[in-house]
């Protein structure tokens, strides 16, 4: 078999297995499956809202599914692993099945669509689109869309980011298709950008030596000014002090003058005696 035909056959088998599991696990809240081929066989991971209903009592239902997959689709040693879908309101397959079930139970399509859209957005989805098509209220078919948030419709982001689910509601007037597309929270979109604050520079510790050197000239100037002020104050104090004058007698002579004259006369007398 050519390589191209082999890939086509594998894709066709995968689609048939997905359709079979969706039909068998409708009541368990089927949320999709992932099939991988390994050297030990075919590994199938089933996501469901109620994993206990997939396994069954004592593993009875999961063994039945394993036998049917091996016999009907000729899978090599199929091994089924059941996982919980997590937040069911963010799984497009689960939301589409709920919407189809609501329409089958008689809900008005606008009420059902708006209710599901609000639940999905309240769960934290970045965007959601619900498309309901078929005979909604009259004999003619029409399409109604309910949109909220951000949705990619084309390109690689639409294939990798957007989760798509489809379900059919069967009513008396005919079949109604329900398509749900959800952008989960945390999805990285190609046109997203983020502004980050610049990194903070580490605070530098002040250098003590420079501060000391800068402080020395100012201290020297203050010392000189203080010394000059002290000298000036001493000079002013000396100038302001009054000059003391000796007391005078009635004749206008100081009391020491007579003593000095007496000493002079005694010296003259002594000199005359020596001359003789």
UniProtKB/Swiss-Prot annotation:
<keyword id="KW-0694">RNA-binding</keyword>
<dbReference type="InterPro" id="IPR004044">
    <property type="entry name" value="KH_dom_type_2"/>
</dbReference>
<dbReference type="InterPro" id="IPR027488">
    <property type="entry name" value="Ribosomal_uS3_arc"/>
</dbReference>
<dbReference type="InterPro" id="IPR015946">
    <property type="entry name" value="KH_dom-like_a/b"/>
</dbReference>
<dbReference type="InterPro" id="IPR009019">
    <property type="entry name" value="KH_sf_prok-type"/>
</dbReference>
<feature type="domain" description="KH type-2">
    <location>
        <begin position="17"/>
        <end position="86"/>
    </location>
</feature>
<feature type="compositionally biased region" description="Basic and acidic residues">
    <location>
        <begin position="258"/>
        <end position="276"/>
    </location>
</feature>
<dbReference type="InterPro" id="IPR004087">
    <property type="entry name" value="KH_dom"/>
</dbReference>
<keyword id="KW-0687">Ribonucleoprotein</keyword>
<dbReference type="Pfam" id="PF07650">
    <property type="entry name" value="KH_2"/>
</dbReference>
<dbReference type="InterPro" id="IPR001351">
    <property type="entry name" value="Ribosomal_uS3_C"/>
</dbReference>
<comment type="function">
    <text>Binds the lower part of the 30S subunit head.</text>
</comment>
<feature type="region of interest" description="Disordered">
    <location>
        <begin position="193"/>
        <end position="276"/>
    </location>
</feature>
<keyword id="KW-0699">rRNA-binding</keyword>
<dbReference type="GO" id="GO:0022627">
    <property type="term" value="C:cytosolic small ribosomal subunit"/>
</dbReference>
<dbReference type="InterPro" id="IPR005703">
    <property type="entry name" value="Ribosomal_uS3_euk/arc"/>
</dbReference>
<comment type="similarity">
    <text>Belongs to the universal ribosomal protein uS3 family.</text>
</comment>
<comment type="subunit">
    <text>Part of the 30S ribosomal subunit.</text>
</comment>
<dbReference type="GO" id="GO:0003735">
    <property type="term" value="F:structural constituent of ribosome"/>
</dbReference>
<feature type="compositionally biased region" description="Basic and acidic residues">
    <location>
        <begin position="228"/>
        <end position="240"/>
    </location>
</feature>
<dbReference type="Pfam" id="PF00189">
    <property type="entry name" value="Ribosomal_S3_C"/>
</dbReference>
<feature type="compositionally biased region" description="Low complexity">
    <location>
        <begin position="214"/>
        <end position="227"/>
    </location>
</feature>
<dbReference type="GO" id="GO:0006412">
    <property type="term" value="P:translation"/>
</dbReference>
<protein>
    <recommendedName>
        <fullName>Small ribosomal subunit protein uS3</fullName>
    </recommendedName>
</protein>
<dbReference type="InterPro" id="IPR036419">
    <property type="entry name" value="Ribosomal_S3_C_sf"/>
</dbReference>
<keyword id="KW-0689">Ribosomal protein</keyword>
<dbReference type="GO" id="GO:0019843">
    <property type="term" value="F:rRNA binding"/>
</dbReference>
């Amino acid at each position: 078999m050519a390589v191209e035909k082999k890939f086509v056959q594998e894709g066709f088998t995968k689609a048939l297995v997905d359709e079979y599991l969706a039909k068998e696990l409708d009541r368990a809240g089927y949320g999709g499956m992932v099939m991988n081929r390994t050297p030990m066989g075919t590994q199938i991971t089933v996501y469901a809202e109620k994993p206990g209903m997939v396994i069954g009592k004592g593993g009875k239902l999961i063994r039945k599914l394993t036998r049917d997959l091996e016999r009907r689709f000729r899978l090599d040693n199929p091994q089924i692993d059941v996982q919980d879908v997590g937040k069911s309101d963010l799984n497009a397959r689960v939301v589409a099945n709920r919407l189809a079930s609501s329409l089958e139970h008689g809900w008005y399509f606008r009420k059902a669509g708006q209710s599901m859209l609000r639940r999905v957005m309240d769960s934290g989805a970045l965007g959601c689109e619900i498309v309901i098509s078929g005979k909604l209220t009259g004999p003619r078919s029409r399409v109604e869309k309910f949109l909220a948030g951000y949705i990619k419709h084309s390109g690689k982001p639409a294939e990798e980011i957007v989760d798509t689910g489809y379900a059919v509601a069967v009513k008396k007037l005919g079949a109604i298709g329900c398509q749900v597309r959800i952008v989960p929270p945390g999805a990285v979109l190609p046109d997203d950008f983020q502004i980050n604050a610049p990194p903070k520079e580490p605070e530098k510790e002040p250098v003590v030596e420079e501060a000391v050197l800068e402080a020395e000239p100012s201290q020297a100037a203050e010392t000189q000014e203080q010394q000059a002020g002290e000298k000036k104050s001493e000079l002013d104090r000396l100038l302001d002090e009054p000059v003391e004058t000796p007391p005078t007698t009635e004749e206008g002579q100081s009391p020491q003058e007579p003593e000095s004259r007496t000493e002079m006369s005694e010296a003259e007398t002594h000199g005359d005696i020596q001359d003789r």
